[in-house]
């Protein structure tokens, strides 16, 4: 019997040792959890500014509404009040108010202070408010894709908000408090407090005024050209700063279309970075730069355009099917002659052409600090046939993002590689001091761009300022392959000042449907709008040596044969783009009687 009693006491001693010594810490923590509550203190996200210090995104205090069902005296009263004040479904609230098997349940996040105050004043049993942090965008939809937005729990979802989320979000804090068995806080019992650390502030490279100038032009495109999308950007050629960047349509960052995820996703994308397209004639800037650098051509070099070239037995047409005739390289660039650029690409050959594509960054991501960048689509060099190379010369059979194209163009017209960036550095060094072409080639390309811009006349000419430019028109392709008939992307690249560019812009019009689609008529006029307003904002003085253009009156050519119309245009110094089979003129743009600059390229439809 004594042995049995001794064994029992021994077992109890071992059990007591296990409880007190081995499991003591664990049990202490469990007990502590039962009578303490940890309250998260949400860290304010850092503020986002533009390069001038204008606020683009800022955090402010809102409130989260919770209910502790065990403390609710009248579920109907509480559910009625909250559903009315918060504009949410009564049944949903009532169901949550009845959940007595949990300590508390969330009713709504991010309630504005005014509404939270009304809830507080009603002294509803079991209803509690906790401070939260929400995001506010003072400019609504300005730079919406670039800035991006956060989720309801303050996590960056798109744009800068997502890309730099780790910097912006800060570190949440916590307060640990005593509570009773129902989870109710015991007043004055704060155990300890960890302060929230605010996120870092960011300064973006964009200038809000330039951004507004760009977006105004894009909005005009959407309205006047009835386009599917309109995109554009302004870049500092000297250092790669993105001064403005946008795609329309867009949405107000304070009123997200969360109920339509397709719209939310599509309009959140920075298409200039994510979407590839066939650039068309704007790509000719790269082809001519490579050919000039290799000494394969000169501004006085002669080319003949019959309206087509036959390559590998395949007929490839120039956009001007009746041909441009004999022309110098300077004239061919101004005419945007496809035949000339087929010749230049073939002179380069596949090996050299691809060497320059690599130098210009084609087929590679630029590394810009925006999520979702595409690398473009460059045919494997080993697969390129002669006919493919000919088409590449004028911007077909190759796909890239607009940011890739502008990265390449800026490295050519500025003479050095640039670091594209969305973040602003006050003392950022100009470019990388890494040349991709010689200074002489840069000079010649800028001359070509100034000449081409002058040829578009009325549509891009800004009196008193030397602007360079190149237009482009490219057909779109179906996802399944093959040309998507009647669908085009019209574009314009502009530079200023033409001889030594500081600024470069691009305007893209996706699927214009107002009756015309040529880049010179659809995209270039909005490039002019951007430059005009940019010069006013920058207080840019007019240049004494800028080109002064003579005015002429547009004649009535409707009903004439194409041949007679061309004779009339030649008499007064106008050029034309021709749409149709070359018969009788049925439509002209601009209409008869319009005062336009001599040298303007007009549209004739036959």
Stretches found by the model and what they are:
Residues 57, 180-191, 232, 237-281, ...:
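Beta-lactam-recognizing serine transpeptidase/beta-lactamase-like catalytic domain environment
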Residues 540-582:
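Glycine-rich loop/hinge motif
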Residues 596-606:
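Conserved "repeat-terminator" motif of extracellular CCP/Sushi domains
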Residues 413, 453, 528-535, 539:
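Short amphipathic alpha-helical signal-transduction/dimerization elements
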Residues 65-67, 492-493, 501-517, 604:
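Short, well-ordered beta-strand elements
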Residues 422-424, 551-558, 587-592:
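Short, recurring structural edge motifs at helix starts
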């Amino acid at each position: 019997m004594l042995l049995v009693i001794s064994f029992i006491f021994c077992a109890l001693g071992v059990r007591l040792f296990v409880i007190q010594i081995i499991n003591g810490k664990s049990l202490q923590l469990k007990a502590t959890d039962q009578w303490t509550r940890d309250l998260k203190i949400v860290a304010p996200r850092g503020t986002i500014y533009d390069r001038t210090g204008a606020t683009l995104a800022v955090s402010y205090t809102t409130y989260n509404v919770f209910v502790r069902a065990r403390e609710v005296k009248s579920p109907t009263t509480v559910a009625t009040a909250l559903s009315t004040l918060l504009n949410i479904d009564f049944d949903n609230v009532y169901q949550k108010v009845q959940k007595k098997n949990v300590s508390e349940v969330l009713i709504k996040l991010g309630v504005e202070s005014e509404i939270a105050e009304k809830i507080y004043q009603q002294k509803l049993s079991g209803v509690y408010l906790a401070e939260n942090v929400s995001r506010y965008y003072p400019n609504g939809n300005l730079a919406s894709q670039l800035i991006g937005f956060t989720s309801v729990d303050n996590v960056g979802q798109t744009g800068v908000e997502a890309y730099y989320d780790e910097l912006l979000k800060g570190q949440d804090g916590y307060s640990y408090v005593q509570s009773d068995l129902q989870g109710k806080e015991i007043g004055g019992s704060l155990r300890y407090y960890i302060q929230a650390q605010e996120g870092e502030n960011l300064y973006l490279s964009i200038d809000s005024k330039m951004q507004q100038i760009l977006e105004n032009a894009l909005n005009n495109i959407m309205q006047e050209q009835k386009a599917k999308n309109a995109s554009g950007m302004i870049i500092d050629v000297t250092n790669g700063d993105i001064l403005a960047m946008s795609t329309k349509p867009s949405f107000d960052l304070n009123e997200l279309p969360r109920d339509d995820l397709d719209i939310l996703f599509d309009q959140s994308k920075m298409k200039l970075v994510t979407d590839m397209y066939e650039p068309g004639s704007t790509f000719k800037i790269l082809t001519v730069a490579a050919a000039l650098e290799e000494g394969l051509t000169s501004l006085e070099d002669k080319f003949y355009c019959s309206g087509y070239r036959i390559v590998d037995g395949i007929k490839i047409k120039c956009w001007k099917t009746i041909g441009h005739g004999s022309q110098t390289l300077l004239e061919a660039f101004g005419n945007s002659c496809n035949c000339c650029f087929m010749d230049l690409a073939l002179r380069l050959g596949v090996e050299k052409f691809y060497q320059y594509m690599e130098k210009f960054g084609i087929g590679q991501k630029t590394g810009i600090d925006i999520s979702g960048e595409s690398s473009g689509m460059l045919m494997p060099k080993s697969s390129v046939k002669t006919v493919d190379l000919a088409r590449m010369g004028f911007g077909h059979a190759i796909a890239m993002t607009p940011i890739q194209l502008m990265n390449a163009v800026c490295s050519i017209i500025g003479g050095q590689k640039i670091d594209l960036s969305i973040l602003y550095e006050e003392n950022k060094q100009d470019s990388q001091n890494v040349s991709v072409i010689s200074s002489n080639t840069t000079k010649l390309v800028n001359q070509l761009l100034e000449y081409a811009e002058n040829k578009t006349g009325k549509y891009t000419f800004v009196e008193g300022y030397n602007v360079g430019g190149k237009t482009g028109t490219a057909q779109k392709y179906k996802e399944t392959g093959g040309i998507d008939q009647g669908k085009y992307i019209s574009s314009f690249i502009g530079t200023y000042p033409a001889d030594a560019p500081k600024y470069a812009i691009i305007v893209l019009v996706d699927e214009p449907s107002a009756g015309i689609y040529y880049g010179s008529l659809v995209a270039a006029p909005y490039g002019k709008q951007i430059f005009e307003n940019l010069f006013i904002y920058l207080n840019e003085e007019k240049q004494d040596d800028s080109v002064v253009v003579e005015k002429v009156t547009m004649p009535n050519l409707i009903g004439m044969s194409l041949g007679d119309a061309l004779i009339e245009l030649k008499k007064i110094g106008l050029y034309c783009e021709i749409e149709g089979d070359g018969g009788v003129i049925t439509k002209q743009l601009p209409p008869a009687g319009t005062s336009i600059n001599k040298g303007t390229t007009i549209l004739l439809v036959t």
